[in-house]
């Protein structure tokens, strides 16, 4: 950076502003461009892919102000904040600079513009603080007005926080240094999420429009989070302060899905994209609010049986009334994003097209009322909710319909927003502007008739404005009401009061029209803002209507059935399918499977080759639970789902390179978390646990984990354990609640007499006996020379050992588990051992085995 004395006045002004806003990329207004300088320019150039230039040795780049929103959006998506620095006043004298200041700060969590947001994705700002034993949080989507708080005072491991963040996928997180240090090691905040260090706003002063003091009793951390978040928002978007009212959300009312489960089950994304996820498959919603609500339901399945049945019954009613869905879909298609429009209305940022969209949305009130008259029994509680607001909706619809043009320009300053007939003064001004020639001609004819001056005419020049001109010969007929304005050689020019009024109207009509239109538009907007609570409630009800009808439609399209839901520990389904995988395959080619857990079987050990369908089997069990507990029908011929409190997964390999952790270390940490957190109501999915180390280490760990999870007399979590360790099948003989299954494979000879296999994708009861690894390699396209060599090596090994490799390993492991070590394992009180102690025991046993 240049020395201060070498800087131009403009750059000194910029540096002064930037020094006070070091965390922002400053969009510095210069005429028709926003310019960025120095480090901001370098970063913006990289993010935006625009040219980096120099002026006076200072790096700079710029974007047109009228297209700034697109560029700001790209920067926000990178997790950065933008400060809009505008010219707010003119300098004194020609040499003086424009006065400039930051007029708005846009952060990833405070965006409200549609073109910076995804229509069907919530945009959360989350504030999190931890204390000695737990944590509190506030979650706000300023674009919709959603605002809730929660607290878990007894979650020292922060498991609940991890699940909450996984479900929210926040755009921005506020925390203090203490909290950051605690959550950093757990990797629960992705690197792409913007994080801001803020001080805690601890105050006993609760805003008057918030819930009363009693709601916050014992929830000090949650209240602190709420106050801190509001203070942060108020700095960046002052208009929101009085529009955001929190409610308390008990997250223990929802099925817990941690980040691993959300990611590996591909609930809302697959490899970062929405396509290929469960959400994408299920989303036939018509409104943006419906799309966001559907995603929220997928990530937050319910635990309360009555609430689940309430949703399920609404879906079932739509399922039984397909015409109700078809007719509702037509109505909902005209509804815009009411939630986000109303947030912009409340802050005074709603534009003409926002109100035009709102007008179209509210115009459905008549059709919606008729629909409820016809199909109200389908969703009785929503009927009452929506119809109670119909009078207000109708009044607002009438206001918008009479006031706002249906296809207005983007900006208020472009004019043409207010409808003809809404305001008499505006109509008069427009008539004056549009009919000025006609008005002047009519005046001229009236004055000729009144005065009898046949040569009278009306004219205009830039010096004197409008005038009435009379020839010298007829000037004697001019009435006393005329005021002389100019004398010419052959004529006299006059002005009258009426002509003055017409002149004023014509010359100032455009300015007055714009000023009056702006005032009228603002008046309509303020009137709408008075009903923001009703409108948000209406939008929420519309979203639920959309989702209920959508889920019924999915049930028809994908041939889902209504499951039995209860408080039991049963997880049972006949002909269960994975709906996303099924949708990717040719019609009718997906192979369904049965599942039966929680009765006689607590743990299913599933063996078989890669590509045999084990992982899909695990995932479809989880999808079954999620769909059932969100109130949906399920992809099975029949299903019985006892409510599950947590779905915990250890599926797939993932290095934590940034944390210096190997695949195996990540696997062990995730497994340790599962062992420490599961309950008898949990569903655990384990896929190839232990494979990241040596064979004996892996077998030992997998064996010990299975024993740790096993609880006699139905006291343990439901577990599906897919493994290549065939040795684990011995556990079925030792424990009554463990049962073996295998992925079925068909062996056959091809035309050349070569052994081949076909995957049948059927999960059958009983243990598998081969891994078919070489066959899988062949199917995957390994070079023929590699396959031939592998077959020769395994034959040589089997010949050398005098038995098959797999049989020999079975014998070794059999010896291992008949040794004194197994007696020690039997004596371990698994209820009293922590996951870390269990792993230490395993390492000790390993040392003794190797010695």
UniProtKB/Swiss-Prot annotation:
PROSITE patterns: DNA_MISMATCH_REPAIR_2. InterPro entries: DNA_mismatch_repair_MutS (IPR005748), DNA_mismatch_repair_MutS-lik_N (IPR007695), DNA_mismatch_repair_MutS/MSH (IPR017261), DNA_mismatch_repair_MutS_C (IPR000432), DNA_mismatch_repair_MutS_clamp (IPR007861), DNA_mismatch_repair_MutS_core (IPR007696), DNA_mismatch_repair_MutS_N (IPR016151), DNA_mismatch_repair_MutS_sf (IPR036187). One of its GO terms (cellular component) is cytosol. The keyword RNA-binding does not apply. ATP binds at residues 608-615. Keywords: ATP-binding, DNA damage, DNA repair, DNA-binding, Nucleotide-binding. GO terms for biological process: mismatch repair. It holds the Pfam family MutS_III. One of its GO terms (molecular function) is damaged DNA binding. This protein is involved in the repair of mismatches in DNA. It is possible that it carries out the mismatch recognition step. This protein has a weak ATPase activity. Belongs to the DNA mismatch repair MutS family. This is DNA mismatch repair protein MutS. It comes from Elusimicrobium minutum (strain Pei191).
């Amino acid at each position: 950076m240049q020395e201060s004395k070498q800087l131009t006045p403009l750059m000194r002004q910029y540096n002064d502003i930037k020094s006070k806003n070091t965390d922002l990329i400053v969009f510095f207004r210069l005429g028709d461009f926003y310019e960025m300088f120095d480090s901001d320019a370098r970063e913006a150039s990289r993010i935006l892919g625009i040219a980096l230039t120099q002026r006076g040795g200072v790096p700079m780049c710029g974007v047109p102000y009228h297209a700034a929103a697109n560029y700001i959006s790209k920067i926000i998506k990178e997790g950065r904040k933008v400060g809009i620095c505008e010219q707010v006043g003119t300098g004194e004298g020609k040499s003086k600079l424009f006065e400039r200041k930051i007029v708005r700060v846009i952060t990833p969590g405070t965006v409200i513009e549609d073109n910076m947001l995804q229509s069907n994705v919530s945009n959360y700002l989350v504030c999190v603080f931890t204390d000695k034993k737990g944590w509190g949080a506030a979650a706000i989507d300023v674009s919709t007005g959603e605002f809730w708080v929660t607290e878990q005072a007894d979650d020292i491991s922060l498991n609940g926080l991890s699940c909450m963040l996984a479900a929210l996928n926040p755009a921005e997180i506020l925390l203090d240094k203490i909290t950051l240090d605690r959550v950093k090691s757990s990797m629960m905040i992705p690197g792409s999420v913007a994080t801001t260090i803020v001080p805690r706003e601890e105050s006993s002063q609760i805003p008057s429009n918030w819930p009363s003091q009693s709601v916050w009793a014992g929830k000090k951390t949650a209240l602190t989070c709420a106050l801190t978040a509001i203070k942060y928002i108020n700095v960046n978007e002052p208009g929101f302060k009085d529009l955001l009212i929190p409610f308390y959300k008990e997250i223990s009312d929802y099925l817990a899905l941690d980040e691993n489960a959300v990611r590996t089950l591909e609930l809302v994304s697959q490899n970062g994209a929405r396509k290929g996820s469960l959400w994408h498959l299920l989303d036939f919603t018509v409104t943006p609010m419906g799309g966001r609500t559907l995603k929220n339901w997928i990530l937050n399945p319910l635990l309360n049986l009555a609430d689940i049945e309430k949703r399920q019954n609404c879906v079932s009613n739509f399922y039984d009334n397909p015409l109700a869905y078809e007719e509702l879909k037509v109505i909902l298609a005209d509804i815009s994003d009411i939630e986000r429009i109303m947030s912009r209305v409340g802050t005074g940022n709603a534009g003409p097209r926002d109100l035009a969209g709102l007008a179209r949305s509210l115009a459905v009130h008549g059709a919606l009322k008729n629909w409820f008259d016809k199909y109200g029994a389908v969703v009785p509680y929503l009927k009452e909710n929506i119809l109670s607001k119909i009078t207000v909706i109708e009044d607002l619809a009438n206001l918008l319909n009479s006031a706002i043009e249906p296809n207005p320009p983007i900006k208020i300053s472009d004019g043409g927003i207010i409808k003809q007939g809404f305001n008499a003064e505006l109509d008069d001004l427009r008539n004056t502007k549009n009919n000025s020639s006609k008005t002047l001609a009519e005046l001229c004819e009236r004055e000729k008739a009144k005065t009898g001056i046949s040569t009278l005419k009306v004219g205009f020049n830039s010096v004197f404005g409008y005038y009435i001109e009379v020839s010298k010969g007829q000037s004697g007929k001019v009435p006393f009401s005329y005021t002389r304005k100019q004398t010419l050689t052959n004529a006299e020019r006059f002005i009258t009061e009426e002509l003055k009024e017409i002149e004023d109207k014509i010359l100032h009509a455009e300015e007055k029209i714009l000023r009056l239109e702006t005032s009228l538009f603002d008046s309509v907007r303020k009137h709408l803002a008075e009903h923001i609570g009703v409108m948000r409630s209406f939008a929420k009800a519309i979203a639920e209507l959309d989702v209920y009808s959508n889920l019924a439609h999915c049930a028809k399209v994908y041939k889902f059935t209504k499951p039995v839901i209860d408080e039991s520990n049963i997880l049972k389904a006949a002909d269960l399918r994975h709906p996303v995988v099924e949708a990717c395959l040719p019609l009718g080619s997906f192979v369904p499977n049965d599942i039966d857990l929680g009765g006689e079987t607590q743990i299913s050990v599933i063996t078989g080759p890669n590509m045999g369908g084990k992982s899909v089997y695990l995932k479809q069990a989880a999808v079954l639970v999620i769909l059932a507990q969100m109130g949906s029908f399920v992809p099975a011929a029949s299903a019985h789902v006892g409510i599950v409190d947590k779905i915990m997964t250890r599926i797939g390999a993932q290095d934590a390179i940034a944390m210096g952790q190997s695949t195996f270390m990540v696997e062990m940490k995730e497994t340790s978390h599962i062992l420490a957190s599961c309950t008898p109501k949990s569903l655990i999915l384990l896929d190839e646990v232990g494979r990241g180390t040596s064979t004996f280490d892996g077998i030992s760990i997998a064996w010990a984990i299975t024993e740790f999870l096993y609880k006699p007399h139905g006291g343990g979590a439901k577990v599906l354990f897919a493994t290549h360790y065939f040795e684990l099948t011995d556990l079925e003989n030792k424990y009554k609640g463990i049962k073996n299954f295998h992925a079925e494979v068909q062996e056959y000879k091809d035309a050349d007499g070569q052994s081949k296999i076909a995957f049948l994708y059927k999960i059958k009861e009983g243990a598998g006996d081969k891994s078919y690894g070489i066959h899988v390699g062949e199917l995957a396209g390994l070079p023929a020379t590699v396959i031939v060599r592998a077959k020769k090596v395994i034959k040589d090994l089997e010949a050398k050992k005098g038995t098959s490799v797999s049989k020999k390993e079975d014998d070794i492991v059999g010896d291992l588990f008949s040794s004194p070590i197994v007696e020690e394992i039997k004596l371990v009180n698994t209820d009293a051992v922590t996951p870390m102690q269990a792993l230490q025991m395993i390492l000790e046993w390993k040392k003794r085995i190797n010695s």
